[in-house]
């Protein structure tokens, strides 16, 4: 009986886990940069005024119930932006749609010197 209870508890825990899944798209015709450190990538609420180049998009598929902490979402944006060589990622869309869940789109950018 305790094995069944343990299995049921494990199944519940797995089913109730929050998730942040990412898909990235690098833009065509944009120079490729070496990866940066995720900790150095800024997450911005909108497009910055500083001169920059757009490297690509980061699409996050985020669980709604339970929702992950905001820090986990921002960390995933940093990680994916860093893979493209970005200095920052700014959010262009963050929406929850019935039946689709939460979708967030960010643009990975590299500031010009």
Which positions does each model-derived feature cover?
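Post-signal-peptide N-terminal segment of Sec-exported extracytoplasmic proteins
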Residues: 35-69
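Short acidic, glycine/proline-enriched helix-loop-strand junctions
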Residues: 49, 67, 96-113
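Short helix C-cap/helix-to-loop transition motifs enriched in small/turn-promoting residues
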Residues: 2, 85-87, 111-112
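Sec-dependent bacterial lipoprotein signal peptides
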Residues: 1-17
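Bacterial Sec signal peptide processing site at the extreme N-terminus
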Residues: 15-33
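Envelope-exposed proteins and targeting segments
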Residues: 39, 54-56, 85-88, 100-107
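Short, well-ordered alpha-helical segments
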Residues: 55-93
């Amino acid at each position: 009986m305790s094995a069944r209870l343990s299995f049921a508890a494990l199944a519940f825990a797995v089913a109730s886990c929050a998730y942040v899944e990412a898909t990235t798209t690098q833009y065509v015709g944009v120079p490729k940069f070496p990866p940066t450190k995720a900790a150095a990538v800024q997450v911005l609420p909108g497009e910055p005024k500083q001169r920059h180049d757009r490297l690509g998009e980061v699409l996050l598929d985020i669980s709604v119930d339970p929702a992950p902490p905001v820090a986990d979402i921002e960390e995933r944006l940093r990680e994916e932006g860093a893979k493209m060589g970005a200095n920052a990622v700014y959010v262009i869309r963050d929406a929850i749609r019935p039946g689709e869940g939460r979708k967030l789109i960010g643009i990975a950018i590299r500031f010009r010197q």
